Curated annotation (Swiss-Prot):
Organism listed in the record: Rhizobium meliloti (strain 1021)
Stated name of the protein: Urocanate hydratase
Entry's transmembrane regions: none
Enzyme Commission (EC) number: 4.2.1.49
Reactions performed catalytically: 4-imidazolone-5-propanoate = trans-urocanate + H2O
Location relative to the cell: Cytoplasm
Signal peptide start-end: none
Lineage, top ranks: Bacteria, Pseudomonadati, Pseudomonadota, Alphaproteobacteria, Hyphomicrobiales
PROSITE patterns per the UniProt record, alphabetical: UROCANASE
Role description: Catalyzes the conversion of urocanate to 4-imidazolone-5-propionate.
Keyword annotations: Cytoplasm, Histidine metabolism, Lyase, NAD, Plasmid
């Protein structure tokens, strides 16, 4: 029987100013959907997989074709509804409504398990959208580089006096998200040893310049790390192997990194994590023939992996969970101390979230890198005092290879996002940019996610699992006029552990776009300030008052 998710075709986004849809507001999601499946962007485009285990852009290739046809035919007062990667309806709305509304992999809480999802998935009734895979705003590994960089820099401030020179970071996973780690480490001044079981993933990161070297033995990798750290030269190496085997061996040998984390796809025990002692071929075959055996073996391996991370933590090495839910699996497997080391958000990132600062990203629909370089200069012009951001933009231009449509990410917050959006829109209007820009973000943002083992871990008021906030964020972005809005479940940490929302807005140079941009790019980060102010964070309360937010049940107005 033919697999409806397999096709050998090659998809790439159109470039230039000629459009095949009826307006840029529908051409934009069309191009970004196609960009998600560009072979230079997606991890497994022939299977519709963008990143993150089985994070897909569309449910089947037939659904992809129907989405494309629907977008090309969509009028300026119509909205396309997409249910778990399947286009299910077109309805008349109005010009300021989103052109696309997306809901991916959402399940009633009692049934929000991998077992139930996988059953639906096999029947063709669901699709795992991850975060930006099914919401069509993945920009390649760059999308997580700055967040990882900010985490490593802050860890360096807290633990090493502000410098990571001569230090090295041990991690696992070089997929679409984990692949950011070696480059982020090098940008932060550190060396990085990343363990990865898939040689194709290592080669992908080498090809896109996210990784410097590869090694096939621990001895070879450690020789590089020792040489680089001694010279104070920040470089990275990908070690072919299984993290669940390599990390315990490093503990036994007394090897001591300066920081430990992990970004294997542990959120998905069947499709994302290679069990100890298994070959890649055996793993791939048994995922189809005996998924329960794969899951059992993978979960046991994750426990061993986390035990090794705890050994590093106990020896005084800064150790952090990077949001793949590996601690939860280890705890479920009987490792009571699995949560002794913290997640990266409460340890290093939450103060940024309190001010609505998060992963603001944009892509040039023209396909011309010069459009991104012009926007880089505009960001510096509008934020002249943010030298840290200027340094990031300089490093990004020098080190980050574009994947698919040229794009940029930089972390900015409430009060700055809408200013940048309006400036980009004016650049489109004036012809300074060759074609419209789309602005979006990761679902990992200050007001758009409930994920008790990641973004909302250890909230001050204990509201870690309250998921009203991402629902309100999606509703507000819809009401504000985002070009497309998405609401997902299970991204990052897997089924049952997160709900989150995303938005994208198109800057097409029109007055209508300017009005929408001002609303969306103010309201979206403002919900993050609101959420953290409600949880009792003084930084967020101060930010809310400084920005004049009206929060009657929070500020006591």
């Amino acid at each position: 029987m033919n697999n409806p998710r397999h096709n050998i075709r090659e998809v790439r986004s159109p470039r230039g100013t000629e459009i095949s849809a009826k307006s840029w507001l529908t051409e934009a999601p069309l191009r970004m959907l196609m960009n998600n499946l560009d072979p230079d962007v997606a991890e497994n485009p022939h299977e519709l997989v963008v990143y993150g285990g089985i994070g897909r852009a569309a449910r089947t290739w037939a659904d992809f074709d129907r989405i494309v046809a629907s977008l090309k035919d969509l009028n300026e007062d119509e909205t396309l509804l997409v249910q778990s990667g399947k286009p299910v309806g077109v309805f008349r709305t109005h010009k300021d409504a989103p052109r696309v509304l997306i809901a991916n992999s959402n399940l009633v809480p009692h049934w929000a398990t991998w077992d139930h999802f996988n059953e639906l998935d096999k029947k063709g009734l669901a699709m795992y959208g991850q975060m930006t895979a099914g919401s069509w705003i993945y920009i390649g590994t760059q999308g997580i580089v700055q967040g990882t960089y900010e985490t490593f820099v802050e860890a360096g401030r807290q633990h090493y006096g502000g410098s990571l020179k001569g230090k090295w970071i041990l991690t696992g996973g070089l997929g679409g998200m984990g692949g950011a780690q070696p480059l982020a480490a090098v940008m932060a001044g550190a060396c990085c040893l990343a363990v990865e079981c898939n040689p194709d993933s290592i080669d992908f990161r080498l090809r896109t310049r996210y990784l410097d070297e590869k090694a096939e033995t621990l001895e070879e990798a450690m020789e590089m790390i020792e040489r680089w750290t001694k010279a104070g030269e920040p470089k990275s190496v990908g070690l072919l192997g299984n993290a669940a085997e390599i990390l315990p061996e490093m503990v036994r040998r007394g090897i001591r990194p300066d920081m430990v984390t992990d970004q294997t796809s542990a959120h998905d025990p069947i499709n994302g994590y290679l069990p100890k002692g298994w070959t890649m071929a055996e793993w791939k075959a048994k995922r189809e023939s005996d998924p329960k055996a794969v899951e059992k073996a993978a979960r046991a391996s994750m426990r061993d992996h986390v035990e090794a991370m705890l050994a590093f933590w106990d020896s005084g090495v800064p150790t952090l969970d990077y949001g793949n839910n590996i601690r939860q699996v280890a705890k479920d497997e009987g490792l009571e101390r699995a949560f002794d080391f913290p997640g990266f958000v409460p340890a290093y990132i939450r103060p940024l979230f309190c001010r609505g600062i998060g992963p603001f990203r944009w892509a040039a629909l023209s396909g011309d890198p010069e459009d991104i370089y012009r926007t880089d200069r505009k960001v510096k012009e509008l934020l002249p005092d943010n030298k840290h951001l200027h340094n990031w933009l300089d490093m990004a231009r020098e080190r980050i290879a574009f994947q698919g449509l040229p794009a940029r990410i930089c972390w900015v917050g409430l009060g700055d996002r809408h200013r940048l959006g309006l400036a980009f829109n004016e650049m489109v209007r004036s012809g300074e940019l060759k074609a419209p820009i789309v602005i979006g973000r990761d679902h990992l943002d200050s007001g758009s996610v409930a994920s008790p083992n990641r973004e909302t871990e250890a909230m001050k008021d204990g509201s870690d699992a309250v998921s009203d906030w991402p629902l309100l964020n999606a509703l507000l972005n819809t009401a504000s006029g985002a070009t497309w809005v998405s609401l997902h479940h299970g991204g990052g940490v897997g089924m049952g552990f997160s709900q989150h929302s995303g938005m994208v807005i198109c800057c097409d140079g029109t007055d209508d776009a300017a009005r929408r941009i001002e609303r969306v790019l103010w309201n979206d980060p403002a919900t993050g300030v609101m959420r953290h102010a409600d949880a009792g964070y003084d930084i967020a309360v101060d930010c809310a008052r400084e920005k004049g937010l009206r929060l009657p049940g929070i500020l006591g107005e």
